[in-house]
Each structure stands twice: as C-alpha cells, then as structure tokens.
Swiss-Prot record:
Residues 1-61 are annotated as: Domain I. Has three domains with a flexible linker between the domains II and III and assumes an 'L' shape. Domain III is highly mobile and contacts RuvB. InterPro entries: DNA_helicase_Holl-junc_RuvA_I (IPR013849), Hlx-hairpin-Hlx_DNA-bd_motif (IPR003583), NA-bd_OB-fold (IPR012340), RuvA (IPR000085), RuvA_2-like (IPR010994), RuvA_C (IPR011114), RuvA_C_sf (IPR036267). It comes from Bacillus velezensis (strain DSM 23117 / BGSC 10A6 / LMG 26770 / FZB42) (Bacillus amyloliquefaciens subsp. plantarum). The lineage of its organism: Bacteria, Bacillati, Bacillota, Bacilli, Bacillales. GO terms for cellular component: cytoplasm; Holliday junction helicase complex; Holliday junction resolvase complex. Keywords: Cytoplasm, DNA damage, DNA recombination, DNA repair, DNA-binding. The RuvA-RuvB-RuvC complex processes Holliday junction (HJ) DNA during genetic recombination and DNA repair, while the RuvA-RuvB complex plays an important role in the rescue of blocked DNA replication forks via replication fork reversal (RFR). RuvA specifically binds to HJ cruciform DNA, conferring on it an open structure. The RuvB hexamer acts as an ATP-dependent pump, pulling dsDNA into and through the RuvAB complex. HJ branch migration allows RuvC to scan DNA until it finds its consensus sequence, where it cleaves and resolves the cruciform DNA. GO terms for biological process: DNA recombination; DNA repair. Homotetramer. Forms an RuvA(8)-RuvB(12)-Holliday junction (HJ) complex. HJ DNA is sandwiched between 2 RuvA tetramers; dsDNA enters through RuvA and exits via RuvB. An RuvB hexamer assembles on each DNA strand where it exits the tetramer. Each RuvB hexamer is contacted by two RuvA subunits (via domain III) on 2 adjacent RuvB subunits; this complex drives branch migration. In the full resolvosome a probable DNA-RuvA(4)-RuvB(12)-RuvC(2) complex forms which resolves the HJ. Belongs to the RuvA family. Residues 151-201 are annotated as: Domain III. SMART domains: HhH1. The keyword Phosphoprotein does not apply. This is Holliday junction branch migration complex subunit RuvA.
Amino acid sequence: MIEFVKGTIDYVSPQYIVIENGGIGYQVFTPNPFIYKVSNQETIFTYHHIKEDAFSLYGFSTREEKALFTKLLNVTGIGPKGALAILGSGDPGAVIEAIEQEDEAFLVKFPGVGKKTARQIILDLKGKLADVVPEMIDNLFNHEARIEKQEAETALDEALEALRVLGYAEKEIKKVLPHLKEETALSTDQYVKKALQKLLK
C-alpha cells in the first residue's frame, strides 16, 4: 500500500491532478485540485480505491484529511466521490464539528447528501472522530471560538453568493476559495474584494 506520493505537479484539472515521480505520472483525485500549482513539489497522501473495473487514487494534502475521508467511506451511502465532495469544503474541522453537533443542515449542503444520508453520517461517526484531528474535538465546545468561526463562515458564504450574482462560474469561485479560507475575521465586502483581486489577475 502506498502511503503517499512525493513529486512534481504536472497537471491540474477541475477533478484531479497529475503528480510525476520517477518518470511516472499518477492521476490523483483530490478535494480541491486548484490548491496545487504546476511545477510545485508536493507530498500527496493517497488512498487506493479498487473495484472490479477500476483502480483509482484519491489524494490529500494532510494525513488528517485522508483519515476523515476513510471514515466517511464507512458510512452507508457514501462512496469515494461523495466523501471527496464533502472534503471539498476545504475545512475538515467544520465537517467534524457538524457531525459532533448533529448539524444536519450543514451536511445536506454537500452534493449527494440528503437528510437521510446526513443522519446516517451522524449516527455512524459521532464520537468516533477524536483520532482524526484531536485538537479539533478538544475545541468544539469553546463557545467564544465557535461564535467567531460561525461569523467568519457567514461572511465568506455571503461573499461567495455575491460572486455568483456578479456572474462568476462555480469553477472560478472554487479556484479562489482556498485563498479566501486563508484569511480570517474579514467582512463580506473584504472577502469579495480579495476574491476579485485574484479573479481579475
């Protein structure tokens, strides 16, 4: 079993990246391929999914992301594509928090996750994620930190909706989202300005 692939990013598409190592290009499906840049050296933590008619590699920037992905695969009704879409939010901590707080409304935002699947995720995983990212679990009940985080997420959500109103496609928005998530405590207007700076380059 290959734990990770370390090499040069050769190609980036909306669904996957190609990372070259030793003259071999590995096609790796990732939650958000646009966080990677062509020619950069990267370490991708991999998960092998084998079916009768396919062999696929799924890759993650951290071991914690990979661990959460494998946990999600244990949930009835969640396959690799569904788990990848959930992690595409770019914030594993928010996913874990939603599970621990039984926040079905958050989980149903993801493609392919209805109320029944959201409930199944909570039933199967609540209380079983401390080994994925322990410090996230420790901080879940810090009320002040949670309020600040929720306010920041609201501002970011409003900014993303504003970009859609301005006519930007989901592909373009997804490309700048990782840069926006690096910022903290910004207002909706500030997030929009940051996004436009990236989009208009």
